[in-house]
Amino acid sequence: MNLPEHFLVTGGAGFIGSYLVERLLADGKAVTVIDDLSTGSLDNLQAVIANPNLRVIESKVSECRALSEIVAESESIYHLAAAVGVELVVNSPIRTIQTNLRETEVVLEAASRYGVPILLTSTSEVYGKSQKPAFSEEDDLLIGPPHLGRWSYACSKLMDEFLAMAFVRERKLPVTIARLFNTVGPRQTGKYGMVLPRFVAAAGAGQPLKVYGDGSQTRCFCYVSDTVEALLRLKRTSAAVGEVVNVGSEEQISVLDLAHRVVSLMNSSSSIELVPYDVALAPGFEDMRNRRPSIEKLWRLTGFRPSHHLDEIIALVAGQPIKKGAPQGAP
């Protein structure tokens, strides 16, 4: 009997990682998850935890004694383990930097030892203070000063990218880097500052939706199944090796309009409050004013574009049907 292909997913008990694990198992693969459960949860894997092709190891990647053995038997690696969420980054910059750098270095070394291809997830945060209407993978990057801890996440993930590309050049390791833009969906928690689950939870409870700053900052939200599909396609595409590729939706909305949209679609009585960044997060906090990807490279390499629109995403996160008569795209 042929054994199923084996994949390692670091951070596989996290929000995105758990959906990726489910998809790999559904495709008949065997999966090992390494996750320290610092921001992930076994609850995210509840639907597949009894699957005989799934093995879960509760550990940091850097402290996993079986890492070499696991990597050696893996067809590919998806490295998603990282510090996540703006509030965690602001409050724990040391943890953020150490987690992102150490875990990535260790998994790249292990992958290089056995020549196992790896897909590394990065972040749109690396675009920093760019004022371009759409971010391209070839753009110069402008990140804020080191005394503002909020940039520690962007800087550490950018160093992950540099390190990964060094492994491509010096050790010929097949690495693909996916820069993710605001992936959302059920299971995502607002605990660490993620905006859409915060808004949906507040609207569902009839509590005020707290918008940081003046709400004019814009974002593009990509549904988690679209993100997972993009990751799988990139991993299967040989032309994506050694490349950085944006993964996200191009449907843009201001955070204030998002709050109004959530209230409207959920038929909520909640009010909307503007909260200064200094109060909500940290003194001197600098936000990215706009965050919209160019996904032409993703389309060129994989033939894939996200298919879920924002109103549908909000309804899926809220766990309810879209309100009748609410036009797509209306605030």
Regions found by a protein language model. Give the residues of each.
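N-terminal Rossmann-like NAD(P)+-binding domain of SDR-like oxidoreductases, especially those catalyzing
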Residues: 1-181, 225, 326, 330-331
